[in-house]
Amino acid sequence: MDTRHQLNESRVPDIGKLTHIPTASVDKQHRVHKDSNPTLDFDFGYPSVTYFEKGLNHRSFTVEHSRSRKTPITTSMENQTPPRKLTIQELNESVQRSSFWLRPLKEELHRNIIGQEHLIESLIISLLANGHVLLEGVPGLAKTLALKTLASAVLADFRRIQFTPDMLPADIIGTEIYNPKDVNFITKKGPIFSNFVLADEINRAPAKVQSALLEGMQERQVTIGDQTFPLPDVFLVMATQNPIEQEGTYPLPEAQVDRFMLKVIVKHPTPAEERLILDRMGTSEVNLTVNSIVSAKDIWRSRKVVNAVFMDDRVKDYIVSIIHATRDPAHYGLKLKDYILNGASPRGTIFLTLSSKANAFINGRGFVTPEDIKNQALDVLRHRVAVSYEAEAEGITSEDIITQILNTLPVP
């Protein structure tokens, strides 16, 4: 459990209280199989979400009734029988089946990274929730090592971009090169066209270079010249940055900061962890090897289950209350108006929902509890709540504001 802020345990309901919630609904759908026998498949009721083992079209489906029929019949979803509700137990079983790679991946990460449990958990959550992650900390805290280890443990394309003050946007997205032989332009794609992109020390480059990532991070596509190219289905930007007080750094544009699902503060290791680091790394010949544990396809399948994790209406309202409390704290009886310059954007609502579902997934549950939301609130919101000059003068941070909101709002 995350202990970064004090929680009133008496206000967190027992998990049994959530068992009576209406179960998530699913749609029964037919799908064409190789044996041509009509079978049933599940869609969890989300427009872009399918059961983790099958890929289905939410709006229509095809049925091949027999080997003699060569033309599939396309039927509208409107003519189908009412959907059957999926029980919490069935959701839990789906989570258990699709999370087989979580434990081996954590063990592989811990082989090279000592301590930093919260960092590792946050990286996995960003992977499952299909959101980008920003790591902030002083140099030497294994930020880059953690991201490189994660990328190596996944069977996917990985590119590293070392941000420097003299970079150009074309160094990231690519450019068009004139070909005098054929008298035309050819497109040379940049390192952003990968499954995993490590933006190392992203705030070492000026804003115009940092902004080259904006389109790819939000729309999962990149425009070079007059051509637009899609990015891979599994696409994750993992960025590191040094605190802004460090010499030679540039603040990230607000539009880019808001595109990161999580901002994780990487802290120094404990004395016991540092002793283990000394024992393992105290040699001039350090050999760090990483085994591939999971494929991009497995991650894609797990994401479908994460999207289907059930969230009760009261839990959804709790998320909305947290976000709105950052914009209008007086409405919730909080005297924080003078300390908040800007509250969280709607992206905060979406990302807090997705990361809470991923947190439930890694804990083996098919439903979200208020504790999942509290666990993720700081990482999702700390870079979305801008504090005023009064707050800075009094030493009040966005984390202090978020913590007070979490400790004040009633828990469903």
List where the protein language model places each region.
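C-terminal engagement/docking regions of AAA+ P-loop ATPases
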Residues: 77-87, 330-412
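Walker A/P-loop
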Residues: 128-164
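Conserved C-terminal "switch" segment of AAA+ ATPases
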Residues: 94-97, 112, 249, 263-336, ...
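Walker B catalytic acidic pair
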Residues: 200-201, 212
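Short beta-strand-centered segment that lines the nucleotide-binding/catalytic pocket of NTP-utilizing
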Residues: 157-169, 226-230
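Canonical AAA+ ATPase core
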Residues: 179-183, 205, 209, 217-308, ...
